[in-house]
């Protein structure tokens, strides 16, 4: 079977400035200890070391650099919880390839959200117990309308996690637009945007949230997160046998090679950059612009730049010995040194172009 050998990533830029939360250094060690406490029952020692090496508290401090000091620890905990949850439901050797088991796993979290009898009871140091604690905090601390939006987003997130396993099992091929639209609606991006708003200590009026430019700038930020994550996580997902990725969708649906798929994804990312700047300028000149709106749209930009920086640095995508390219201009070559020994649901030949070099 023919396999990819490498693909080049042209310069990845992000217009919004990179910022880090001022409490980052203080919180990082504390949050690492917290990660060990809640993740250990679910993980082997090796998995635990890998989990800590992902620098998730650092990611959170770049995603939410302007969050209130009292709220940033809860945002860090949510990001850490979701990352471990996501790893479990995307594991193609387990839940990620078994729709029935994935649905049952997600069902336990749905019970917690809906407040089923006994659902909030702690279960040791488990992932579910961690989520129950987080959810109780958000339920008690968020304004009612903001909490209702959180419920909708997280229910969609769980729905997407379960349906992803079904799509893998069926060998479904999505176009790039279908893939992005699905992730945009149900991925973690929409939840993170809402948590960013909560972290600022504001609740935007529904009238403001429904403004076309506000909706568009949030969508643009989420699309940027999708493009960045999928291009920089492709290598580790490919080597694990996971083809639920934007690059894979482009290859399979269009019959193009991996380099072309990477280039298309980078072009989408650049479109997001340009669109964000245009929308930011438009909103600052609007009649509904306010200090709260300014914090919100700036926060979206910080999420974009923070996610790009972390995605280049994290061991989650590149391994613990990874040395990232130059800080000012992220670019490089992703090597696939060890071709996977498996038969994917959708044969590799179906989407490897003859133009690919090996």
Curated annotation (Swiss-Prot):
Organism taxonomic ancestry: Eukaryota, Viridiplantae, Streptophyta, Embryophyta, Tracheophyta
Further details from the record: Selaginella moellendorffii contains two distinct types of functional terpene synthases (TPS) genes, the typical seed plants TPS genes (SmTPSs) and a microbial type TPS genes (SmMTPSLs).
Taxonomy, superkingdom: Eukaryota
Family: Belongs to the terpene synthase family.
InterPro entries: Isoprenoid_synthase_dom_sf, Terpene_cyclase-like_2
Descriptive protein name: Microbial Terpene synthase-like protein 13
GO BP field: isoprenoid biosynthetic process
Role description: No terpene synthase activity detected in vitro.
SUPFAM superfamilies registered for this protein in UniProt: Terpenoid synthases
An annotated Gene Ontology molecular function: terpene synthase activity
Pfam families registered for this protein in UniProt: Terpene_syn_C_2 (PF19086)
């Amino acid at each position: 079977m023919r396999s990819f050998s490498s693909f080049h990533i042209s310069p990845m830029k992000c217009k919004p400035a990179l910022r880090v939360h001022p409490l980052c250094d203080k919180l990082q060690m504390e949050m690492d200890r917290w990660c060990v406490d809640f993740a250990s029952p679910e993980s082997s020692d090796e998995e635990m070391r890998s989990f800590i090496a992902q620098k998730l508290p650092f990611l959170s401090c770049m995603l939410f650099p302007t969050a209130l000091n009292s709220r940033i620890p809860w945002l860090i905990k949510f990001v850490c919880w979701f990352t471990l949850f996501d790893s479990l439901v995307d594991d193609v050797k387990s839940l990620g390839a078994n729709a029935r088991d994935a649905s049952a796993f997600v069902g336990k979290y749905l019970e917690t959200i809906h407040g089923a009898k006994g659902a909030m009871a702690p279960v040791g140091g488990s992932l579910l117990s961690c989520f129950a604690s987080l959810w109780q905090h958000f339920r008690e601390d968020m304004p009612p309308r903001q909490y209702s939006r959180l419920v909708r987003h997280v229910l969609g997130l769980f729905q997407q996690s379960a349906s992803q396993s079904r799509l893998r099992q069926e060998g479904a091929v999505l176009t790039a637009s279908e893939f992005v639209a699905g992730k945009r609606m149900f991925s973690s991006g929409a939840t993170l945007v809402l948590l960013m708003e909560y972290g600022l200590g504001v609740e935007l009026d529904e009238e403001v949230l429904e403004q076309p430019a506000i909706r568009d700038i949030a969508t643009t930020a989420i699309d940027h997160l999708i493009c960045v994550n999928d291009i920089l996580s492709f290598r580790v997902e490919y080597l694990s046998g996971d083809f639920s990725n934007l690059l894979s969708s482009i290859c399979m649906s269009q019959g193009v090679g991996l380099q072309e798929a990477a280039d298309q994804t980078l072009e989408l990312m650049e479109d997001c950059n340009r669109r964000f700047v245009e929308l930011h300028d438009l909103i600052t000149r609007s009649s509904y612009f306010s200090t709260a709106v300014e914090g919100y749209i700036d926060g979206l930009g910080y999420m974009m730049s923070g996610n790009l920086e972390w995605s280049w640095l994290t061991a989650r995508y590149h391994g613990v010995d990874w040395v990232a390219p130059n800080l000012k201009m992220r670019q490089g070559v992703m090597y696939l040194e060890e071709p996977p020994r498996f038969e994917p649901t959708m044969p590799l030949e179906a989407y490897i172009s003859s133009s690919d070099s090996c």
